[in-house]
């Protein structure tokens, strides 16, 4: 009989999000960047914990807007709508489809302060997917700040690590 269960943490990984630098604002928050795939078929982690940052433009911003990061699951045979499991620009077909296939990882309220870096941390993929974790998924980044993100690639990052239980005897 086990004495206790410890939580173990995998190695921190950085997602490929080429194209998020200079990402244009989209009023409907349907256009954005799909990340590279997070594939859990080999490691079998119980959860993934995400952190990240995005830097807005120096000017032209509108108050009371937002940056969104969504999780999108592979269904075992394919990707929904425009998603394909590769780091690429995507425009979701409609708000209704977005609401049906995307799960909110984080929504960051923004203001009109230029050159501000918006951080998020400790966001659980399992919680975003309402308690179930798909074998593969991508993240989708979109915003409606009224100005493109900073053009410097290093101003933006999404990283994660896997989490799994270890039974001690």
Regions found by a protein language model. Give the residues of each.
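Extended low-complexity, serine/threonine- and proline-enriched intrinsically disordered segments
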Residues: 65-91, 157-163
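Extended, solvent-exposed segments with strong compositional bias
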Residues: 92-130
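Internal, hydrophobic beta-strand segments that form the core of beta-sheet-rich folds
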Residues: 46-55, 65-74, 129-156
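Solvent-exposed, flexible loop/coil segments flanking beta-strands in beta-rich domains
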Residues: 2-56, 60, 167-168
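C-terminal interaction-tip segments
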Residues: 1-21, 132-136, 142-169
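Asparagine-centered strand-capping/turn motif at beta-strand->loop junctions
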Residues: 40, 124-125, 141-144
């Amino acid at each position: 009989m086990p004495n206790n269960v410890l939580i173990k943490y995998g190695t921190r990984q950085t997602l490929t999000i080429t194209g998020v630098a200079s990402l244009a604002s989209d009023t409907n928050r349907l256009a954005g960047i799909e990340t590279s795939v997070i594939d859990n078929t080999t490691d079998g982690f119980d959860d993934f914990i995400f952190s990240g940052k995005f830097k807005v433009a120096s000017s032209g911003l509108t108050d009371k807007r937002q940056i969104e990061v969504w999780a999108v699951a592979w269904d075992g045979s394919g990707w929904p709508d425009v998603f394909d499991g590769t780091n690429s620009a995507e425009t979701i077909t409609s708000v209704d489809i977005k609401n049906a296939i995307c799960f909110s990882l984080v929504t960051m309220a923004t203001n009109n302060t230029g050159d501000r870096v918006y951080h998020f941390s400790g966001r659980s993929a399992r919680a975003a997917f309402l308690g179930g974790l798909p074998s593969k998924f991508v993240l989708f980044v979109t915003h409606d700040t009224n100005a493109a993100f900073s053009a410097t690639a290093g101003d933006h990052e999404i990283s994660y690590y896997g989490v799994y239980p270890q039974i001690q005897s």
